[in-house]
């Protein structure tokens, strides 16, 4: 009888210790600080790519490390208009790594802006994914793209594959050359004239940069919404209420394309007061836009990457 009592006491104590150990381990995981973002240089097909990596805190043993690549827009940078760093921190808190890079001629890139083409940016995204896989062992991968970065993200799965989900912020997804409508939203014939001159002479100066004829040609030959339908990936789409540089037709066609997907969703209402860059002159509105953009994007990516 005493032996049975001692045995029960032993197992009870052992169970309590095990439960306590699990609680301590869970607490330590929650308290593990997210590592600071790290600027890195990624080997690319044309030279170095300047990027920033954000890793999560300690992962459970054997848990796969998901990855999100953040793609900025035309003449932008890896800051993503101030949205990318806080988004990366939020994703890290959910156990998701990110890499955000400067595309050719943008940010810290030492290439001329004429190297800013869809094919070069596609190569750079692929190089960034390969770097993250080889350096950190990342697995399932999603793309977040804003504006022209959203067009790139829409096209990438069809061209290279290996993508689990897409989050598109105000993508410039007009079919063909309509994707460049932002250069002169009031007069598309002026955009066509720019394209003709750039393709004839090699480049054209507009928006304060030299845009290559190759970019115009690649835009003319691409249809991102058709690519979305073909890839049929889980896709989040957002547009604001004051896009300004994207036509109603582009927005309507892209919304229809995404909503036709099995796991496509368009979220518009939280961004009704924002401009194309999800900003506002009113500080409180700008903060609310950023918060809604991050929360919407993180929830979607966690659903499909974790």
What are these regions (language model features)?
Residues 65, 72-77:
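Active-site glycine-rich loops that stabilize anionic/oxyanionic intermediates
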Residues 76-88, 103, 249-250:
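The serine-hydrolase catalytic nucleophile loop
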Residues 88-110:
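Conserved alpha/beta-hydrolase
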Residues 136-147:
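Alpha/beta-hydrolase fold nucleophile elbow
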Residues 145-155:
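Glycine-rich nucleophile elbow surrounding the catalytic serine of serine-hydrolase chemistry
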Residues 28-61:
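N-terminal cap/lid segment of alpha/beta-hydrolase-fold proteins
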């Amino acid at each position: 009888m005493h032996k049975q009592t001692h045995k029960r006491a032993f197992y009870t104590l052992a169970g309590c210790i095990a439960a306590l150990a699990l609680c301590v381990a869970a607490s330590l995981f929650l308290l593990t600080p997210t590592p600071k973002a790290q600027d890195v240089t990624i080997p690319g097909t044309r030279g170095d790519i300047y990027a920033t990596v954000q890793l999560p805190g300690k992962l459970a043993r054997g848990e796969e490390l998901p990855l999100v690549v953040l793609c900025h827009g035309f003449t932008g940078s890896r800051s993503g208009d101030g949205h990318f760093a806080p988004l990366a921190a939020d994703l890290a808190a959910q156990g998701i790594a990110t890499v955000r890079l400067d595309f050719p001629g943008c940010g810290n890139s030492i290439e001329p802006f004429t190297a800013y083409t869809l094919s070069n940016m596609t190569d750079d995204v692929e190089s960034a994914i390969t770097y993250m896989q080889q350096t950190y062992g990342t697995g399932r991968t999603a793309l977040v793209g804003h504006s022209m970065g959203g067009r790139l993200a829409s096209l990438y799965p069809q061209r290279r594959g290996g993508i689990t989900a897409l989050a598109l912020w105000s993508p410039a997804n007009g079919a063909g050359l309509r994707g460049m409508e932002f250069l002169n939203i009031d007069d598309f014939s002026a955009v066509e004239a720019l394209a003709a001159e750039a393709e004839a002479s090699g480049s054209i100066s507009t928006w304060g940069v030299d845009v290559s004829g190759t970019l115009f040609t690649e835009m003319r030959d691409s249809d991102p919404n058709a690519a979305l339908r073909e890839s049929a990936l889980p896709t989040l789409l957002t547009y604001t209420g004051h896009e300004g540089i994207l036509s109603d037709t582009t927005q309507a066609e892209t919304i229809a394309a995404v909503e036709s997907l099995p796991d496509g969703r368009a979220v518009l209402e939280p961004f009704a007061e924002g401009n194309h860059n999800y900003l506002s002159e009113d500080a409180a509105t700008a903060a609310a836009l950023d918060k809604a953009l991050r929360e919407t994007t993180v929830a979607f990516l966690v659903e499909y990457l974790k």
